[in-house]
Amino acid sequence: MANIAHLIVSGLLAATVAHGQQYEGSSRSEDAFSYVQPRNTTILGQYGHSPAVLPSPNSTGSGGWQAAHTKARHFVSQLTLEEKADMVTGQPGPCVGNIVAIPRLGFNGLCLQDGPLAIRVADYASVFSAGVTAASTWDRDVLYERAFAMGQEFRAKGAHIALGPVAGPLGRSAYGGRNWEGFAADPYLTGVAMELSVKGYHDAGVQATPKHFIGNEQETQRNPIYNPNGTITDVLQEAVSSNIDDRTMHELYLWPFANAAHAKAAAFMCSYQRLNGSYACQNSKALNGLLKEELGFQGYVMSDWGGTHSGVASIESGLDMNMPGGLGPYGTIPQAGSFYGGNVTQGVKNGTIDEARVDDMIIRIMTPYYWLGQDKDFPSVDPSSADLNTFSPRSTWLRQFNLTGERNRDVRGDHAKIIRRQAAEATVLLKNEKNALPLKSPKSLAIFGNDAGEPTMGAVNQANFEFGTLAAGGGSGTGRFTYVVSPLEAIQSRAKQANTLVQYWMNNTDIATTDVTTLWVPAPPDACLVFLKTWAEEGEDREYLHVDYDGNDVVSSVASKCNNTIVVTHSSGINELPFADHPNVTAILAAHYPGQESGNSIVDVLYGDVNPSGRLPYTIARNGSEYNAPPTTEVTTTGAEDWQAWFNEKLEIDYRYFDAHNISVLYEFGFGLSYTTFNLSEINAEPLVESISSVPEQRPIQPGGNPALWENVYNVSVVVTNTGDVEGKAVPQLYVTFPDSTPAGTPPKQLRGFDKVALKPGQSQAASFQLMRRDLSYWDVVSQQWLIPEGEFVISVGFSSRDLREVVRVTPVSGST
C-alpha cells in the first residue's frame, strides 16, 4: 500500500519511473536481466502456468476455529444482501481500511491499519525496528515479543487488523525497495519470523495479515499504467508479471507463508503484481489452490490497496475483501464505484455471483474476529487517527463513523525499553580489528556523517532527507515517530559521564572534500565514528547498492587521516562496502533501521553495555554486480503485456546462488562478530520416529497444510562454548545438504535451524534443533507433493553459512525403503 504523497507521484509519473532506472556499475549483458524469457525451463517445471482452481473452497473452522466459525455463520444468517456487500467492501474512513458497522447486530465495524513496524496512522505510538532489523537478531523471543508489543498498541488504538507481517518481498533481488519490511533473503528464517509474528499479534488480540501474497519481489511496475485520456480502468500497460515455476514457488516463496498459515493467520493480503500472467488478487491457482486448499487457510484474503482488477473473477478466484473499496489508482476514488460493493448485490440478484460464495467470504472475515474475542470490550478507534489519515481524509467519507472514544491515547507503555534492547541485539558487527570496540573511556571522539544528527525535517515521518539519522524506511510500512534518539544525542549523553570531548561534522559534501585534520581540535581523536545511511521505500526499487550522499567518499576522507575509523550503517539492507578492507577502518556495524531508540541502541553496543549478537539475514557481495536476479526496471516496448520478470534463477537467491557458483563474498549470510569467541562440539542427530517414508502420510488438511509435514523427525544437538573473556550470545546455525538423488537445481545447502544461546566466559550449553519432515523434503512437480529423497543428508552446524564446524550425516530414506 502507498501513502498519499507517494500515490500522487506514482500515479502521475508511473511511466517515467518505470523506464528511468539503471544499475550503476553493472556490466550485465541483456541476457542476464530477468525480463528475458529463459530458454530452458524443464528442470524445475513449467513457467507461466496458473491453471484455474474453482470454485473457491468453503471454510470449515478447522484448526480450533470451530466455535468462532459457528458464531460467524450465525452472524451471516442475519445479514441483508446489502449488508453482505458492505462486509466485503472497504469504505473510506478513520483507518487506512474500514468495514462499516452494523449497529442492529452489535457489530462496530473493522479498523485496518498499517503496518509492519508500527501503527502508522496514529499519534503517541511507538516505532519499532524494521523487519530486516528484527531478523538480524536471529532470536525467536525477540521476534515474538516485538509483534506482541506492536499488537498491544494496535489494539489500544482501536485497530482490529494489523497489516503485517511481511514475507513478500522475500528478498529475491538486492535492489528490492521493500526488502526492509520483510525479514530475510531465506525462506526458513523468514518463515520462523512470520510464524512468531503472527502468534505475537494474535496473543495481543489483533488480527495479523501476512503480506504480500505472492511473488511480490519488485516495486517497479507493480501496478498497471492507466491511460490518462481513457476511463478509470483503461490500462496502457499491465503490471509486471512474476513468472515462477512450481518448485521454486513451493520451496522459496510459499514456504514462509505456509508458516503464517500454520500459525492460523487471520488474513492474507494478496499482492499488486501479476503472477504467471494473472493478477495476484484474482489468481485462483494462488488463492484457491495454494492458499485455501493446499495450506488449509481458514481466514480471509484481502486485496492490497487498489489491487483488485475485477469483480466476479476476483470473487470466484478467492478474494474475500476488496480494499480500500473504490476504483482508480490505489482504490482511492470510491465515488467512481467499486468492483465489489453494489456489484456484489447486483451479481447475486442476477445470478452472476453465487450468494453462498459471498456468505463464505463473510464467514472467513468474521471467524477470526470471534476467535480473538474482538466482539467483546474491544477499544474504539482513536478519533485522532481520522485526523492523521491522509489516505482517506474526512472529505472522502461516504458513510458516518461513530468516533466517540478517547482522543490522542498514549499507547506506548514501556515499549521504548524493548525497542532499545532489540535494536542493540540486532546490530551486526562486521569488522572489529585492533580491539577498536568496545570503546574504552575515550578522551576524544569525532563524529562524522549526515546520519548522525537529528532529522532536520522533524521526526514525525521518515523521508529521504539529507540531514538526520535514518530509523525507518518509507511508504506504508513506516511509522509516525513521536521522537527519534539520534546517534549524536546518545553519544553526547554518554560522553558526559566520562568528560569525553565530542566534536562533530554532518555535511557529507564538506567532509568528503576537506582535510579532516583541519576540523578536529586540539589533537587527533581516539576514535572517529562515521554514520552512513541508505534510503529505501515503497513504490520504487533501489538504483544502486552503495550508501547514500557520497558516503563512501566520506569514509575515505576520514579514514585517510584517522587510524581508528568506526563505520555505522543505517540501511534498508544490502550495501556495497568498498572500504571494508581499508586498514584504518577498524570496525563496521550494520544497524539497519532500528526504530525510535536508534542512538541509544548503537551506543549500548559501542560502549560494550551490549555484546553484539546480530547476524546477517542476507549476503554482502564484494561487488554489487555479482548479485543475480535484478528487478525488471526497463522495457523498451509499449505492449500491454511486455512487463515480465522471469524468475529463471529458480532456487538460487542470495547465499544459495553464491554457494552454487562458488563465488567469494565479503560477508556471508549468517555472519556476525562478537566481543567474545565461541566454539562448537559434540554434534549428534537423534531420530524421533522409528521409520520414515519418502511420501508423507496423507492426513486431513489443517492450517499450514498436511500435518505430517510439521512433525519433528530428528533432533540435532550440539554443545556451544564461550571461549572468550566476556559474556555473549552465540547463534549456532544448522544447514542441510540434500542427497544427490534430489532433482537438479537443489542448492548446495539450506538453512533449517538456528538457536541463540547466552553464555558466560567458559560456560558450555547444548543447543538443539528440531528438524521437521518439511525441512528434509523437496517439492516434486510430477507427484505434486513433498518428498524426502533417498540417500544421505549432510547436516552441518556452524556460526554462518560459510563457517560450518560440526557435521553429522543421516539417511532418513534408504534406497531399499
From Swiss-Prot:
Glycan-bearing residues: N40, N58, N229, N276, N343, N350, N402, N507, N563, N584, N623, N662, N679, N715
Pathway assigned in UniProt: Glycan metabolism; cellulose degradation
GO MF annotations in UniProt: beta-glucosidase activity
Domain of life the protein comes from: Eukaryota
E.C. no: 3.2.1.21
Protein's name according to its UniProt entry: Probable beta-glucosidase G
Active site: D304
PANTHER family recorded: BETA-GLUCOSIDASE, BETA-GLUCOSIDASE G-RELATED
GO BP term, example: cellulose catabolic process
Pfam family, one: Glyco_hydro_3_C
Role according to the record: Beta-glucosidases are one of a number of cellulolytic enzymes involved in the degradation of cellulosic biomass. Catalyzes the last step releasing glucose from the inhibitory cellobiose.
Catalytic activity entry: Hydrolysis of terminal, non-reducing beta-D-glucosyl residues with release of beta-D-glucose
Signal peptide interval: 1-20
Disulfide bonds, paired cysteine numbers: none
